[in-house]
Design a protein with these regions (language model features):
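C-terminal edge and immediately downstream basic/flexible tail or linker adjoining helix-turn-helix-like DNA-binding
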Residues: 1-12, 17, 25, 154, ...
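A short, charge-rich alpha-helical start-of-domain segment used by transcription regulators
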Residues: 3, 15-39, 49-52
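Acidic, proline/glycine-rich intrinsically disordered inter-domain spacer in sigma factors
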Residues: 12-14, 105-133
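Amphipathic, Lys/Arg- and hydrophobic-enriched alpha-helical face
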Residues: 28-48, 64-65, 132, 184
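Short helix-capping/turn signature of helix-turn-helix
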Residues: 32-34, 43-44, 144-151, 161
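Structural recognition of an alpha-helix C-terminal capping motif at a helix-to-coil junction
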Residues: 50-60, 64, 72-84
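Arg/Lys-rich amphipathic alpha helix in sigma70-family domain 2
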Residues: 81-101, 113, 121, 184
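Helix-turn-helix DNA-binding module
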Residues: 133, 137, 141, 149-166, ...
């Protein structure tokens, strides 16, 4: 990243330059989408101990390529970068077998009115996370982006670089597999 912006650091771009405008445009998306990228990476299996670093790397890689990203494609580019980065982190985690305790960002942000409600919500989240972990990555990515992050089929197709019809079929398969997985887990099976 330092090489890409070395000239820009020596000679700051004028506020009207294409680089400055692209950097500002991408910077707004990066700021707005931080939590989305964090959750996406976590749900794609990036270990909890690495998810903050992976999020920052995805954001930095996107900013470093700001000149190459077309307007209105910033979010898709950022999510695609995060998607590809998740493979790197999962590969590294498999090699090191470092499995830390799961920390759910939503749990840190909410307070339940009763201990029973909080416990049930935590159990539901753990069940969902375990069921999601059983899905193949390509199904988990589509389901997470659509159901949990609210992206459209077109946006998902762009992020994952697959046809829109493939998004629909993977979503249908993912929902079916998730339903079966949740049912098995509730019955106490594997």
């Amino acid at each position: 990243m330092a090489l890409i912006h070395a000239k820009a650091l020596r000679e700051p771009p004028s506020p009207d330059s294409a680089l400055a405008q692209a950097f500002d445009r991408i910077g707004e998306v990066v700021t707005r989408e931080y939590a989305v990228v964090w959750r996406f990476l976590r749900r794609l299996g990036v270990p909890p101990s690495d998810v903050d670093d992976a999020t920052h790397i995805a954001l930095a890689r996107t900013l470093a390529r700001c000149e190459r990203i077309a307007p209105d494609c910033e979010r898709a580019y950022l999510m695609r970068t995060a998607y590809h980065l998740s493979f790197e982190y999962r590969r590294a985690a498999r090699r090191s077998q470092d499995r830390a305790a799961d920390i759910d960002v939503d749990q840190l942000e909410t307070h339940e009115s009763t201990p029973d409600a909080a416990l049930q919500k935590q159990r539901d989240r753990e069940l969902l996370d375990e069921a999601l972990d059983q899905l193949p990555t390509e199904l988990r990515a589509v389901l997470t982006l659509y159901e949990l992050e609210g992206m459209t089929f077109t946006e998902i197709a762009t992020v994952l670089e697959i046809p829109r019809g493939t998004v629909a079929s993977r979503l249908r398969r993912a929902r079916g597999e998730l339903k079966k997985s949740v049912s098995r887990l509730r019955k106490g099976g594997c």
